[in-house]
Amino acid sequence: MLAFTLRFIKNKRYLATLAGALVIIAGLTSQHAWSGNGLPQINGKALAALAKQHPVVVLFRHAERCDRSDNTCLSDSTGITVNGAQNARALGKAFSADIQNYNLYSSNTVRTIQSATWFSAGRSLTVDKKMMDCGSGIYASINTLLKKSQNKNIVIFTHNHCLTYIAKNKRGVKFDPDYLNALVMHAENGKLFLDGEFVPG
């Protein structure tokens, strides 16, 4: 009888431990979703929380290209479409709901400049041609912008090959960004860390 009671108690403890572990796992899964490409998904709330700890760097691919679409061009044929501009504006409004304080940069192409302008709705934009050149030197260029921004959060409009390079170099994953997709990085002690993919919402 005593042996049966001890086994019963142990089984109850095991079940309680198992139930607790499942609750923790479920909680982590709901708070830290993962993209199919292997990158953690970071929404606006998570980004805001990260920005309270370190300066964040959000790198967006430009909006829909006019020269690769049948949609109406915003203006210049080397820029973005009207649809792309509207999407950039909507994304900017959603982004600013969580991150109000940031400096804005773009590469020196019409499509990135237009994307950044519509995203920010009037915020001052600095154009930096180094945001077009993506390779090992991209990190030094980003750190230079952080210093210029006095370690404020920064938003950069750049190109798909830049985002692909960073994802592969920092996390060893293949990232093929669509228009207006973004990566989130943070700076700590002079080093840049890739946190994941920005997912609005």
Swiss-Prot record:
Pathway assigned to this chain's UniProt record: Bacterial outer membrane biogenesis; lipopolysaccharide metabolism
Predominant cellular place of this UniProt entry's protein? periplasm
Localization, UniProt: Periplasm
EC number(s) on record? 3.1.3.-
Q: Does the keyword Chaperone apply?
A: no
InterPro entries, per database record: His_Pase_superF_clade-1 (IPR013078), His_PPase_superfam (IPR029033), LipoPS_heptP_Pase (IPR011310)
Q: Which GO terms describe its biological process?
A: lipopolysaccharide metabolic process
- Gene3D superfamilies named among the record's database cross-references: Phosphoglycerate mutase-like (3.40.50.1240)
SUPFAM superfamilies, alphabetically? Phosphoglycerate mutase-like (SSF53254)
Q: Which keywords, in A-to-Z order, does the entry hold? A: Hydrolase, Periplasm, Signal
Give the EC class as a word.
Answer: hydrolase
Which domain of life does the protein's organism represent? Bacteria
What's the short name of a Pfam family annotated to this entry? His_Phos_1
MF terms in GO: phosphatase activity
Task: Give me the Gene Ontology terms describing cellular component.
Answer: periplasmic space
Instruction: Explain the purpose of this protein.
Output: Catalyzes the dephosphorylation of heptose(II) of the outer membrane lipopolysaccharide core.
Protein family: Belongs to the phosphoglycerate mutase family. Ais subfamily.
Identification of the protein by name:
Lipopolysaccharide core heptose(II)-phosphate phosphatase
Query: What gene is it encoded by?
Result: ais
